[in-house]
Amino acid sequence: MLDPKVKKAIDFAYQRILKFHKLQKVKDINYVDKLKNKIQYKNIVIDSVGLYVPANLPSTALMVGVPAKIAGVKKIVLANPRHNGKLNPAVMYVAKKLGIKNILSIGGAQAIASMAYIYKTSKIF
């Protein structure tokens, strides 16, 4: 069960992080010079990322998950080890808020290896 005060704090932090990182989003550039040369700068989104969230740190999930969501990453895998046999409700709330469907309840090298070799994520944070 998630304490309503914690939920409110997460919602507040989420909005602030979202606003800041939206400002960082790079735009594609299309340019035609006077000689009719077309120059293009195109951003290509990473197709999948793995987020390693150690222990009870929903802030880590926010700080790495929100930018991935803004960038348009299609598949996000979150690894968060159980603490005293339980999933952290605050981290799970962040995962739900970000629409993360792939959640691993493991930690350490096993989590990193699973995200790299089983889920085949392109980048791990």
Stretches found by the model and what they are:
Residues 18, 22, 69-73, 100:
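Charged, amphipathic alpha-helical interaction segments
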